[in-house]
């Protein structure tokens, strides 16, 4: 996966609890990395999750795909990069890349999210987030100090 607007959003050190009997990071541990990446991406776009929760909006994961390329090992420091790739009326897609200490890509993933209210009804993506997400997609974010604007 090569996405021009992927940005490093977090680092994570693999713990013993993340590993399986083969002493590598268990495949089921990766979705937590995507959650960390997603939360930090939103924060960097100026829209931290607590703001949405306060408005009664939630991002439900409706689809996840992951390609595991190389294993992560205990105590490796991983780099998580993420980018918004698609924004629709009540859905959005995010891509992720997890790199190991040597810079090799260990995993790539995509998650698709529905914006829901507290009753699980679909809701429009708020205009201000839509604009920030579209800026991430195109690399034209206009906010001062934004990660897509030097």
Question: Model regions: which residues?
Answer:
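Active-site beta-strand->loop segment that positions catalytic residues and contacts the acyl thioester
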Residues: 62-77, 83-89
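Conserved beta-strand segments that form the floor/walls of ligand-binding pockets within enzyme
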Residues: 26, 61, 67, 79, ...
């Amino acid at each position: 996966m090569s996405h021009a607007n992927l940005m490093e959003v977090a680092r994570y050190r693999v713990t013993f609890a993340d590993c399986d009997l083969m002493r590598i990071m268990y495949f089921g541990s990766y979705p937590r990395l995507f959650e960390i990446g997603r939360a930090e991406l939103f924060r960097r776009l100026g829209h931290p999750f607590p703001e949405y929760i306060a408005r009664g909006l939630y991002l439900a994961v409706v689809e996840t795909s992951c390609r595991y390329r190389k294993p992560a090992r205990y105590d490796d420091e991983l780099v998580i990069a993420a980018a918004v790739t698609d924004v629709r009326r009540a859905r959005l897609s995010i891509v992720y890349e997890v790199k190991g200490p040597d810079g090799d890509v260990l995993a790539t993933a995509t998650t698709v999210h529905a914006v829901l209210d507290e009753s699980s009804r679909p809701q429009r993506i708020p205009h201000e987030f839509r604009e920030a997400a579209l800026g991430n997609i195109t690399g034209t974010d206009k906010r001062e100090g934004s990660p897509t604007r030097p």
